[in-house]
């Protein structure tokens, strides 16, 4: 009896809200930001709200005359229901009634979901991981006031497309439609990191891909976006240290050893306060599965609507949900699910990847798409694939190889002299930030051109910087040191 009384009260609340729309048509936009027609318990009320929305779309008055005209022939609202709606007494505090309708709708959907979970759990053929993933998606949809929709009509899609074109026109000559990468020339290729896209950033070890990632993180923060960083290799504190070094222009060595003068301490304090105000979130557990990343991002997005981008360092350290699969199959599954998650949350996801060692055997060590380790479906799933290449790293390795060769030939003194010289040059290079060129190679770009972006890497501050177009150094001149002969 109590339940029946509650339903009668709910119907009355729905009538009052609909009557309020008839009295004040402009309120429908605010109400629609919370409610959908499916949120109404009593079906005729949901149909009434749907008709009212269609009238509002074409700037028609929402009144008794137009409601009756627009009523579909196959779905009629009874005369008694119409009279009850138009006769209901609207109230001033309609927001509370709207929330009550939404609250009741969510409870009904939760009840339905609970029954579905029970039925699926009793089916022995259903895998628990599949059930959990489905539950996560449904709960996330409820938290965001939406449902998992089916087909979208061409009219709706075209309207959305035109809104996007109009928004880009409003931005004028700006070429960045997504989140700025932090590099003007890279933005010219990509138009920034756009929502729903999966971006792969690949490099060999020691190339500095984590530093490049942190540069991109800071760029997104400057665009007032919320940023999530999954760091499976470095602690959050280590990444924060790099960010502070970049922002303060205090080299990492001095920052770690706290050898700072008064001005540097003051600068550090200012940057600390500035960065503390940003929406930057770290998840730095060394072991993480794909389903955990999905759960954490959904939770973070529901708590912080301004979340605009996520970074993962790096993909091959993640674990698949099904341990029985071959590793390349797990990686392919992870990349596919990351792409799906990016579209679901409507954010770009940037995943760092390790490249195959085999590229070291080539004369030209610039990466190509086939160098992606355990590539599987990564290349296929990615909207953009970026590679990082620093010739200076290979120059150092060539110097080390020459020293080893001299030792094997018995030229110990010559090897020691070269070793001392090389170490001193590297120390000066690291401390003083000698000019070093770095290439960001756009190897795949689903919606644009491919090519190479030239930047400078400022080693002491782990900072990548824009380089003017066509001003990059010639091969073998990226530093003041010459490539050693063999």
Swiss-Prot record:
Domain of life: Bacteria
Catalytic activity, as annotated: Couples ATP hydrolysis with the unwinding of duplex DNA at the replication fork by translocating in the 5'-3' direction. This creates two antiparallel DNA single strands (ssDNA). The leading ssDNA polymer is the template for DNA polymerase III holoenzyme which synthesizes a continuous strand; ATP + H2O = ADP + phosphate + H(+)
Subunit structure: Dodecamer.
Keywords assigned: ATP-binding, DNA replication, DNA-binding, Helicase, Hydrolase, Isomerase, Nucleotide-binding, Primosome
GO MF, one example: DNA binding
Signal peptide range: none
NCBIfam families xrefs: DnaB, PRK08506.1
Enzyme class: isomerase
Entry EC number(s): 5.6.2.3
GO cellular component, one term: cytosol
An example Gene Ontology biological process: DNA replication, synthesis of primer
Family of this protein: Belongs to the helicase family. DnaB subfamily.
Role noted for this protein: The main replicative DNA helicase, it participates in initiation and elongation during chromosome replication. Travels ahead of the DNA replisome, separating dsDNA into templates for DNA synthesis. A processive ATP-dependent 5'-3' DNA helicase it has DNA-dependent ATPase activity.
Protein name (record): Replicative DNA helicase DnaB
Domain (SF4 helicase) ranges: 172-471
Primary gene name: dnaB
Pfam families: DnaB, DnaB_C
Binding locations of ATP: 203-210
Source species: Helicobacter pylori (strain J99 / ATCC 700824)
């Amino acid at each position: 009896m109590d339940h029946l009384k509650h339903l009668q009260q709910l119907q009355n609340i729905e009538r009052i809200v609909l009557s309020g729309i008839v009295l004040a048509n402009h309120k429908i936009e605010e109400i629609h930001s919370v409610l959908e027609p499916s949120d109404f318990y009593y079906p005729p009320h949901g149909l009434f709200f749907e008709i009212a929305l269609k009238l509002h779309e074409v700037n028609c008055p929402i009144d008794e005359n137009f409601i009756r005209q627009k009523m579909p022939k196959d779905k009629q609202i009874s005369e008694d229901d119409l009279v009850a709606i138009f006769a209901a007494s609207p109230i001033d505090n309609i927001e509370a009634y709207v929330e009550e309708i939404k609250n009741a709708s969510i409870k009904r959907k939760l009840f339905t979901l609970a029954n579905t979970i029970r039925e699926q759990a009793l089916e022995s053929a259903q895998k628990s991981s599949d059930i959990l993933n489905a539950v996560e998606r449904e709960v996330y949809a409820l938290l965001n006031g939406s449902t998992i929709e089916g087909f979208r009509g061409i009219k709706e899609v075209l309207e959305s497309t035109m809104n996007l074109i109009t928004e880009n026109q409003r931005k004028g000559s700006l070429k960045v439609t997504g989140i700025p990468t932090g590099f003007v020339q890279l933005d010219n290729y990509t138009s920034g990191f756009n929502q729903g896209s999966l971006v792969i950033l690949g490099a060999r070890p020691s190339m500095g891909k984590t530093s490049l990632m942190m540069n991109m993180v800071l760029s997104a923060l400057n665009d007032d976006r919320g940023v999530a960083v999954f760091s499976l290799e470095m602690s959050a504190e280590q990444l924060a240290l790099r960010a502070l070094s970049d922002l303060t222009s205090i080299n990492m060595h001095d920052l770690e050893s706290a050898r700072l003068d008064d001005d540097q301490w003051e600068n550090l304090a200012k940057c600390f306060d500035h960065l503390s105000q940003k929406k930057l979130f770290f998840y730095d557990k060394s072991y993480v599965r794909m389903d955990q990343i999905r759960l954490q991002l959904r939770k973070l997005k529901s708590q912080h609507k301004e979340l605009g981008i996520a970074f993962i360092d790096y993909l091959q350290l993640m674990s698949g949900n099904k341990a029985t699969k071959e590793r390349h199959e797990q990686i392919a599954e992870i990349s596919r699910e990351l792409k799906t998650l990016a579209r679901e949350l409507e954010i770009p996801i940037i995943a760092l990847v390790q490249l195959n060692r085999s590229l070291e055997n080539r004369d030209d060590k610039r990466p190509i798409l086939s160098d992606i380790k355990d590539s599987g479906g990564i290349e296929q799933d990615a909207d953009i694939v970026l590679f990082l290449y620093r010739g200076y790293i290979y120059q150092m390795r060539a110097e080390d190889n020459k020293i080893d060769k001299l030792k094997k030939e018995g030229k110990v003194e010559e090897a020691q002299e070269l070793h001392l010289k090389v170490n001193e040059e590297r120390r000066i290079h690291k401390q003083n930030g000698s000019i070093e060129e770095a290439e960001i190679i756009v190897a795949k770009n689903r919606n644009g051109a491919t090519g190479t972006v030239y930047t400078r890497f400022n080693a002491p501050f782990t900072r990548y910087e824009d380089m003017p177009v066509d001003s990059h150094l010639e091969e073998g001149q990226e530093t003041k040191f010459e490539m050693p002969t063999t």
